[in-house]
Regions:
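Conserved short alpha-helical segments that host acidic/polar catalytic motifs at enzyme active sites
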Residues: 2-181
Length: 181
């Protein structure tokens, strides 16, 4: 499986000068790699614990050697996932995400994890916390590669990154090499 998770945790230097002692809300990201375990349930409980970081939406991507399955929706973690849904999310690796919008609208298309497939069939699930400071440059690169239309406004920074990573993967280039490029 080729899954990439980028995690950013804000530090005190990222806080507004006026509120240095107060935490800022940002998303929560939780990852699990545990062969032989029910990673969807472990991820669910991790997201439940992180839910204070984002109560707008949540999602879990679970994978094995053959595929990645993503389930995500708007709402609280406990309202999105039930026993039936978690049982259907089978695999040995997972990434979960709770959303608090800082960029992009409060709409389903911005709920993470993001999912993209490379031209060679490699699936990528990405959970991202924070804002990409070079989003406009990445977006322009995605437009130049034909991944998004020039005037398409609904592409979040995380979806843009996911599409660029997938686009860079081929027989000779791994997801990790694509991220370095």
């Amino acid at each position: 499986i080729n899954a990439v998770v980028e995690v950013h945790t804000p530090s005190i230097t990222n806080l507004d000068d006026h509120n240095e002692q107060e935490p800022r809300e940002e998303c929560g990201v939780y990852g699990v790699w545990a062969p032989g375990e029910e990673v969807s349930k472990l991820t669910y409980f991790g997201l439940f614990a992180l839910q204070h970081r984002g109560q707008e939406a949540a999602g879990i991507a679970v994978g094995d050697d053959d595929r990645i399955v993503v389930f995500k929706d708007m709402g609280l973690v406990a309202n999105i996932f039930d026993e039936s849904t978690l049982s259907a999310l089978q695999g040995n690796v997972a990434v979960g995400h709770t959303r608090y919008s800082t960029a992009g609208g409060k709409e389903w298309s911005n709920v993470q994890p993001m999912f993209s497939t490379s031209s060679t069939g490699v699936d990528i699930a990405l959970g991202h916390n924070g804002n990409l400071v070079n989003y406009l440059e990445l977006r322009e690169e995605a437009v130049q590669r034909g991944l998004i239309k020039p005037h398409e406004e609904s592409v979040s920074d995380s979806m843009c990154l996911s599409m660029l990573l997938a686009d860079g993967v081929d027989e000779d280039t791994s997801v990790f090499d694509s991220a370095r490029d």
